[in-house]
Design a protein with these regions (language model features):
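Double-stranded beta-helix
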Residues: 28-31, 105, 125-156
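Bacterial N-terminal signal peptides
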Residues: 3-16
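Short acidic-glycine-tyrosine-enriched beta hairpin
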Residues: 94, 100-121
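Soluble periplasmic/extracytoplasmic beta-strand elements of cell-envelope proteins
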Residues: 53, 69, 95, 134-138
Length: 156
């Protein structure tokens, strides 16, 4: 009985300390970026796409995290990246296709909550169809995007 009481008191003290710590957060322990603080910028060379860097720097070595916002009816053209990229769909449906010929009708829908991995050096294209899509992309920089078919020729 005494051992049970001692355990209960110990657990109560530990839980009480955890709650006290959570209530008075130590600044600098967690970096928080609220959605209303995100400064979206136009993605160079891809009208209709905006992005924000949340962590790291994609052009430098190391981990980076970005979000990209695709306006309705906006898709990238066939391209590849030198690094693996890990993509989580945050909002809407994101459409992904593979190959050097741009064929939006052959893309696969990835709804909000879905996940995809871009394999380094593999050609793909992606974007939004009828609704806005927001994706979060992470990888190890330096990142790059190499367009394969700059003219964006469609499948005939």
């Amino acid at each position: 009985m005494r051992a049970c009481l001692l355990i209960a008191l110990t657990v109560g003290v530990v839980l009480g300390q955890s709650n006290a710590t959570a209530a008075g957060q130590d600044e600098g322990t967690i970096s928080i970026v609220q959605t209303d603080q995100m400064e979206w910028k136009d993605y160079p060379g891809l009208p209709g796409v905006k992005f924000v860097v949340l962590a790291g720097n994609p052009s430098q070595p190391g981990l980076y995290v970005i979000r990209a916002k695709f306006a309705p009816h906006t898709m990238s053209r066939p391209h590849w990246h030198p690094e693996a990229r890990y993509v989580t769909v945050m909002k809407g449906t994101w459409w992904a296709g593979t190959g050097e010929v741009f064929d939006p009708d052959s893309t696969t829908p990835i709804p909000a909550g879905g996940f995809a991995i871009h394999t380094p050096g593999k050609v793909h294209y992606d974007g939004a169809k009828d609704e806005e899509a927001i994706v979060q992309i992470s990888g190890m920089g330096p990142s790059g995007t190499n367009v394969v078919n700059p003219g964006g020729a469609k499948k005939e």
